[in-house]
Each structure stands twice: as structure tokens, then as C-alpha cells.
Curated annotation (Swiss-Prot):
It comes from Agrobacterium fabrum (strain C58 / ATCC 33970). It is a multi-pass membrane protein. It comes from the Bacteria. One of its GO terms (molecular function) is metal ion binding. This is Divalent metal cation transporter MntH.
Amino acid sequence: MFFMRMICNCINSISMKAQKMDKPVFGWRRNGDDLSLSDVHSSIRIKPDASTFRRAMAFFGPGYLVAVGYMDPGNWATSLAGGSKFGYTLLAVALVSNIMAIVLQSLCARLAIASGRDLAQACRDAYPKPVAMVLWLLAEIAIIATDIAEVIGTAIGLNLIFGIPLELGVLITALDVFLILYLQKLGFRWVEALVITLLGVIAVCFAIQLALADPDWGQVILGFAPTTEIVTNPDMLYLALGILGATVMPHNLYLHSGIVQTREIGPTIAEKREALKFATLDSTIALMFALLINASILILAAATFNKTGQTNVAELGEAHSLLAPLLGLAIAPTLFGVALLCCGINSTVTATLAGQIVMEGFLKMRLAPWLRRLITRAIAIVPAAGVTIFYGDSGTGQLLILTQVVLSLQLSFAVFPLVMFTSDKAKMGELRSPLWLSAIAWLIAVVIAALNVKLLMDFMG
């Protein structure tokens, strides 16, 4: 009887532990035991006794990694095409897209801090496996589309500065994985430092080019006012959606919800509220900086190309060759090439992290970062190499714009789950989005979906 009682007690103990482990947290089906980016999760300490400024600065960084996606080479192509063809008109789209991005990225930080999950983990928990697999596949397609833009942009940058043929440049881009691995080994702050430094170089390059272009600032200001022609003109809508896809990018939503968790966030509601405040401030400032860069590209195209009748400039190489005679200074195209190369390098860093978050979150599959990077890059290199070999520079611009439209079409499949999760009190607890924020987020989600339906109808028509 004694042994029977011991066995029963052991079984009951094991059963109780299993029930405790299976007990969902808030409205989640599983406990959030899987860590996002486990190798760097909570690796940056935040001292509770530090000053408010120091605690805020501890959250400085992730927003700039997110901002990289808002000024990648694909964005350059759409902004150049929009500025050269329609002047300053599409500045309004860049502004509205940036406001949408600020709202959505704040929701990413909210989801991560409140639930301890990134967006991919949240989708795996909330949806049946077939639905989660579809969302995973769409997220991977978005990352590959992003990577195609980065491959082409980096290859063109290498060609413009060093004269390396595009075909060889496409292959060289596969080597960037070693730089990323080295920096991650040093610590996540080193990754952020590289990205922020290159962003500074990009800003200086465009500041000089804008000073040389001398745009009509009155027209620039008017360009930030939306017009109905953006929706009624199919060509303008196509480029507008390209700008939207290049600005509010699906992979960035997964990325931000993961890298915010590199900070050591306390367990109390007060600590989480403070973390959310600082993380939102970080991403908002970074995205305003990204808007300045995006607007600079479009303004440069409008002031140099559209003004002189060059209304069909979509290829980055063509823009590079036209800048010197139009701006009257030999260094102008070099600055353009340097900024493009910096954007390409930065984008590869963030796409690698996003790919890691998506695969681990949806599939619970942990690949070595170098292997994950090479798989994604190998898939992206095939179409990029094919276009550069058979069509040369003339085809790369169109492929870049196409990748951004593909990203725009994928966007709703990341935005709707994000808005649903952050509006759900059962999942978010006291950190659920307030009603006004949820209303704005739902409006953004519906607008994005409606614009994509309009684009598809125009194509089918």
C-alpha cells in the first residue's frame, strides 16, 4: 500500500506539473517558453536604478534596424520612378506610408513587450497549423522579395563605385553573411552600431546631393498634400503601392517584434509600460529619419530628372549616369553609389534577422544563421542573376519595382494578425491597444487591403 500510494502521488505530481506547463498565459494556447532570437534575447541589460535618459538610451537601436527596411534599394527604385514621372506628387504617399509605419511598428513593440512573443510565434499560437503554414510561406516570399531588391541594389552599388560587373556583384553579395555573423558574435550592439553608422553616411550623401539639386521647396511642401489622382491614375497607383510596399514592409513587422526583446524587460506592468514608451519613441524617431531619406530620393528625382524632361528614370544605373551632367559636379554620382551600397549592406543585416525570426517563430526550426542566410540569398540570387544576365541594367529597375509591389500585396497577411492580437485584451492584458489606437490600426489595415484589391483589379482589367 505504501508503494502504491507513492506511485499515485508521483503520477498526480507529474499530472499537476503538466497541467501547469500547459496552462495558457492570458489568451494564448501555449506558454511563451520559446525565446525570439534566443542567442541575443535579453542580452542588453537595463539598470533599474539608472537615470531616465540612460534607460531610454538602452532602447535606442532597434528602431534604426527597422528604419533600414524603409530605405532599402527597392525603395530607391520606386522613389526614383515616382519622382521622375510625377514630380513631387507622390511625396504625399511617402508621408502617409510613414505614418502608417509608425503606428504598425508601435504595435509590434506592444505585442513583443506585453506577450513576450514575436509576431511569428503569436501567429503559430493563435491559428490552426494549416493557416500558420500559409502565413509562414507568405512571410518567406516577402523576405525573398526583399532580398532580391537588396541583391540588385548592392550589386549596382558595387558596379557604380568599383566597376564590378553586375553578374559578379550579385554573387559577391552572398559573402555578406560572414560580416553579419562576426558582428553578432561581438554583441547585438555592434550590429546596431554598424547600421546607424551607415545610415549616417547615407544622410550625408543625400544632404549634399539635395544642396546641389536646389529643388523648388514650395512645390516640395505642396507635394505632401494628397490628391485624388493618386488613386484614379493606374500608373500613379502602381507606383504609389510600390512606395507603400517599400515603406511598410511585411518582414519589418516580424523583425521589430523580435529585436525589441534583445532588451532585458522587467516583469511588472510598470516596467513593461516604460519599455513600451521608450521602444515606441525609438522607432518613431528612426522612422521620421527614414522619411527624410525617402523624401530626399523622390525630391532629388523630381528636381533633376522630372524638371529636365527625363520622366522615365527607374534604373539606378541610369540615375547614376544622369546625375553628373544635371548637377554639374563629378562627385554627385559617387555619392549616389556610396549611399546605395550602404543601403544594400544595411538591408542584408536586417533581412537575415527577419528570416531567422520568421523561421524559428513559425516552425520552431533553428538553423545556423549562416545557413539560413545562404538559403535565402541563394533563392534570391537566381531571379536577380537571370535578369542581370539577360536584360542587364535595363531590367533591374523593373524587377526592383515589382518586388515592392509583391511586398505590398503580402502586407495584409502580416498586418491583420498584428492588429487583431494587439486589440485582444485576453492576449495583451493591461497593455492592450487603447480603442483610439486600435481604430486607427484597423483603418490602416483596411486601406492597405483595399488598395491592393484595386491594384489587382487594374491588372486583371
